[in-house]
Amino acid sequence: KPTFKETISKEFGAELYTLAFDKKALDKINDWSYRKTNGCVPEILDELSPNAISVLMNALYFKGIWKDPFEKKYTKSGNFWNKGKQVFTKFMCQKMMEIDYYASEAEGVQLIELPYGNEAFSMVVVLPNEGVEINDCIQGLTAEKWQNWMGSAVNKKVNVELPKFKGEFTYEEKLKSALQSMGIKDLFNADKCDLSGIANNLLVSMIKQNTFIEVNEEGTEAAAVTGEEMIGSSGKKPIVIDFIANRPFFYGIKEKSTN
């Protein structure tokens, strides 16, 4: 409907296409994904059901340069441990980074916050202590706990060792079940779904999300050179904390004003 087209374009900057679900439509969808993600997610769909009525697509792309990039000359090889198994990989290393840090023995975690560029965004890396299962840590994470972590982190000098990594993730059934667990059920029920504000007789048949992330010395999916500021010290030996991410960790890209 014209009102829906106007709303999603004006309020969300979204694009709406009316297509026959054939090979040309599939190519158009994947071309959209390629363009919107700078080639990082070249294909969001590998097929379209001939019975499909609608498809909602969301491809995430983030490009950020560290405020203080890791120096490549300090990158080294080492072992990453996961459930007793080791993988030989590259670790970015930087001594005495002045970054926000939080640790809690009671919660069994430590975390760092690595700012990008002008600090509007940052990457938060959460490292469960040895012996703490990462899945337990993630499942126990609430909005309140996250806000407490962010509010309790303080600026420290930290020796950081973080593996370079690249990840590609696809969410389809898990995304649908997650929405249903939050109470969004009628959307997938032909007898109850009411999307008449979009079009008549419409039902959501699939929701799929593809994401891509690459973390290296320069930043997250970035290729740039950034200056580094040096400051003087009082001459006293500073207290330096070690953050060695050589075991499973989880991360999030955070927007500063909203946490």
Regions found by a protein language model. Name each.
Residues K85, T258-N259:
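Residue-level signal for well-ordered, solvent-exposed loop/turn and beta-edge residues enriched
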Residues T142:
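Catalytic and substrate-binding regions of extracellular carbohydrate-active enzymes
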Residues K1-G131, Q147, G151-K236, V240:
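Non-catalytic, conformational "gating/processing" segments within enzyme and secreted inhibitor domains
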Residues E113-P115, K237-T258:
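Feature captures eukaryotic membrane-trafficking machinery centered on endolysosomal pathways
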